């Protein structure tokens, strides 16, 4: 015995759907596609078609690495509002996935499977492709992780042979690499044609090839293939021509070799490094040997090619001048780079300062906008009073600053007068006064003036103290008003409190509903247990008394009468339960009707609020136009 279930959606108004054969066929195809893609939840018969289709679409979207803010695993048989919200969230994700098919939320909520099918088909295809891509990626990642931790026997053998193989390859390349055996003279004439340069380069590395002869042999082979056999005169002419070419080739090689020197002799020439490595000679002898060698070398080069020496010196001078120019340009380039670096640093600093100023300006604008928003929501009378108090505070501060400046000036003037009086009352002044015969009343008048100044100073000081007390009192009043204003919650805070209370109420309602369901389930199971115990006890009693009751006709009649009484009691209990069931059903229908009426009132309320807001907006626009015309 399970819990009694009401109608699906608890009596909510359902959207009309096309219950024709084509819709059912499309639904079957959609479910088959989802199951084939791997969404086996579509096989559950207890789920509604909406839960299966929407769950499958959400599963496909999530498989394609797109987020949908829904939870279909623990919430089924949703209300119409939840269904619409789910449909809107799914439809909002499809454009981000670049789905080529159009779909509206009301089509999903209304279960229009004809229009849902192409979208589901595309989603399943995309999900399968994503699975394959992720499978390849996960496979390669798994292989790389395996190779980081473990290795195969073939890899171990390869690592063992790797170092030896690399060493062998390096040794072979070192042994068989080309080695230069000859080198052309520095003053030798430059080879103009490419074939001669190739011959000279190969001869430097000890290789002698007759390219002309080879090409001639190739030509002869071509002629042999083209001409018929038996032409002896032509063959003799070709042989003679080949001998002449071979002799010319040998002569050419010899002429190239005469312009080269062996690398062993070249290496035996003195250089700065070889001279520096000579051990056992003093520096004077080394310098003398180097100078003698340079003179002999210059004499030999002058004897061999006096005209080419001038060209070499001119070339050397050009090289030196070009090197100097390169050094100057390099130095100038470094200076430009340093200047560019400093300018770039200044530019970055200025850019950073500009960004900070822009950020600070935006922050000030936001704070000003927030302040204006708070001012617009606050009470105008309190705001006006606060503004007056702030203006009074600023005025008092400015008066205090002016009074302090005036007091400083007055104090400076009085101190200057005191210094002057002290200077006048100096001993020299006293002697001069006594010697001149002036009366002592002058000193008394000066003292009276000092007392007057002290009295005025004390009065001003007391006045300043009173002003400070007044300012402190005003500041205290302003602080009290600030606290009172802060204690009054703003409209945004009230809205936030309202939202939190609504959320808390919804949570409490959900917990209460769940607890109520648990109580109902417990009571149902408890009743089921009681009835089963009664049934078991009745069957045991019948089983125990059956053989005794069948022993005599009187006992059998009494047993049958007892059984009829028991059956009658069971029927009465069943009638009571049926009556209770009908009462609960009627109560459920009444509550369902009340719920529908409340939904209609809610819809009307939302519609009225929307119209009221629209009228309020129009009223504000008209008021602003009237104010603009009046101004």
Curated annotation (Swiss-Prot):
Entry keywords, A to Z: Coiled coil, Endosome, Phosphoprotein, Protein transport, Transport
Pfam family, any one: CCDC93_N
Phosphoserine occurs at which residues? 298, 301, 305
Record annotation: effect of changing residue 315 to R: In a colorectal cancer sample; somatic mutation
**Where found, per UniProt?**
Early endosome
Q: Which GO terms describe its biological process?
A: endocytic recycling; Golgi to plasma membrane transport; protein transport
* Coiled-coil annotated residue ranges, if any: 309-631
Annotated region (Sufficient for interaction with CCDC22) at 1-430
Primary localization class, coarse: other
Q: Which domain of life is it from?
A: Eukaryota
Q: Which GO terms describe its cellular component?
A: early endosome; intracellular membrane-bounded organelle
Task: Show the segment(s) annotated as Disordered.
Answer: 1-23, 214-243, 421-447
Record's compositionally biased regions (Basic and acidic residues): 215-225, 421-433
Q: Where is the signal peptide?
A: none
User: Region Sufficient for interaction with WASHC2C: start and end of each range?
Assistant: 448-631
According to the record's subunit comment, the protein's assembly and interactions are: Component of the commander complex consisting of the CCC subcomplex and the retriever subcomplex. Component of the CCC (COMMD/CCDC22/CCDC93) subcomplex consisting of COMMD1, COMMD2, COMMD3, COMMD4, COMMD5, COMMD6, COMMD7, COMMD8, COMMD9, COMMD10, CCDC22 and CCDC93. Forms a coiled-coil heterodimer with CCDC22; this heterodimer interacts with the guanine nucleotide exchange factor DENND10; the interaction is direct. Interacts with WASHC1. Interacts directly with WASHC2C. Interacts with SNX17 and SNX31.
Q: Which family does it belong to?
A: Belongs to the CCDC93 family.
Give a short account of what the protein does.
Component of the commander complex that is essential for endosomal recycling of transmembrane cargos; the commander complex is composed of composed of the CCC subcomplex and the retriever subcomplex. Component of the CCC complex, which is involved in the regulation of endosomal recycling of surface proteins, including integrins, signaling receptor and channels. The CCC complex associates with SNX17, retriever and WASH complexes to prevent lysosomal degradation and promote cell surface recycling of numerous cargos such as integrins ITGA5:ITGB1.
Descriptive protein name: Coiled-coil domain-containing protein 93
Task: List the gene name.
Answer: CCDC93
């Amino acid at each position: 015995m399970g819990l009694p279930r009401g109608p699906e959606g608890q009596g909510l108004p359902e959207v009309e759907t096309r219950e024709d054969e084509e819709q059912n066929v499309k639904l079957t195809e959609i479910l088959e596609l989802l199951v084939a893609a791997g969404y086996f939840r579509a096989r559950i018969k207890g789920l509604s078609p909406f839960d299966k289709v929407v769950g499958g679409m959400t599963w496909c979207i999530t498989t394609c690495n797109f987020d949908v803010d829904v939870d279909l695993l623990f919430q089924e048989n949703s209300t119409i509002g939840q269904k619409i919200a789910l449909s809107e969230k799914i439809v909002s994700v499809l454009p981000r996935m670049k789905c080529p098919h159009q779909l509206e939320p009301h089509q999903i909520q209304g279960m229009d499977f004809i229009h849902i099918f192409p979208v589901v088909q595309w989603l399943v295809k995309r999900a399968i492709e994503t699975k394959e891509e992720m499978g390849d990626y996960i496979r390669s990642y798994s292989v790389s992780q395996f190779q980081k931790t473990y290795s195969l026997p073939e890899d171990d053998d390869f690592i063992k042979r790797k170092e030896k193989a690399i060493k062998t390859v390096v040794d072979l390349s070192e042994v068989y690499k080309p080695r230069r055996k000859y080198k052309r003279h520095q003053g030798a004439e430059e080879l103009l044609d490419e074939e001669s340069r190739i011959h000279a380069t190969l001869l430097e590395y000890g290789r002698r090839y007759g390219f002309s002869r080879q090409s001639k042999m190739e030509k002869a082979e071509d002629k042999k293939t083209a001409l018929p056999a038996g032409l002896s005169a032509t063959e003799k002419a070709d042989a003679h021509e080949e001998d002449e070419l071979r002799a010319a080739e040998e002569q050419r090689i010899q002429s190239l070799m005469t312009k080269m020197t062996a690398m062993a002799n070249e290496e035996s020439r003195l250089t700065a490094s070889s001279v520096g490595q000579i051990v056992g000679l003093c520096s004077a002898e080394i310098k003398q040997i180097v100078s003698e060698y340079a003179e002999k070398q210059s004499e030999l080069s002058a004897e061999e090619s006096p005209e080419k020496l001038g060209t070499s010196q001119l070339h050397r001078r050009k090289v030196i001048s070009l090197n100097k120019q390169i050094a100057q340009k390099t130095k100038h380039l470094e200076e430009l780079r340093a200047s560019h670096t400093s300018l770039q640093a200044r530019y970055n600093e200025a850019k950073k300062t500009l960004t900070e100023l822009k950020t600070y300006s935006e922050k000030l604008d936001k704070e000003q906008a927030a302040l204006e928003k708070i001012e617009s929501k606050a009470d105008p009378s309190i705001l006006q009073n606060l503004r007056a108090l702030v203006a009074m505070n600023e005025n008092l501060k400015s008066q205090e600053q002016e009074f302090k400046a005036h007091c400083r000036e007055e104090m400076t003037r009085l101190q200057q007068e005191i210094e002057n009086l002290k200077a006048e009352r100096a001993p020299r002044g006293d002697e001069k006064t006594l010697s001149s015969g002036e009366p002592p009343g002058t000193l008394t008048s000066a003292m009276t003036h000092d007392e007057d100044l002290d009295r005025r100073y004390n009065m001003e000081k007391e006045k300043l103290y009173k002003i400070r007390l007044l300012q402190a009192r005003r500041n205290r009043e302003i602080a009290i008003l600030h606290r009172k204003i802060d204690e009054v919650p703003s409209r945004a805070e009230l809205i936030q409190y309202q939202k939190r209370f609504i959320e808390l109420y919804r949570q409490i309602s959900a917990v209460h509903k769940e607890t109520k369901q648990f109580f109902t389930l417990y009571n149902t199971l408890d009743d089921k247990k009681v009835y089963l115990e009664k049934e078991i006890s009745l069957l045991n009693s019948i089983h125990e008394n059956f053989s005794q009751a069948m022993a005599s006709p009187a006992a059998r009649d009494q047993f049958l009468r007892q059984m009829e009484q028991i059956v009658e009691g069971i029927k009465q209990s069943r009638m009571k339960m049926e009556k209770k069931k009908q009462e609960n059903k009627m109560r459920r229908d009444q509550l369902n009707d009340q719920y529908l009426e409340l939904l209609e009132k809610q819809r009307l309320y939302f519609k009225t609020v929307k119209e009221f807001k629209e009228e309020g907006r129009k009223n504000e626009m008209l008021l602003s136009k009237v104010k603009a015309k009046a101004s």
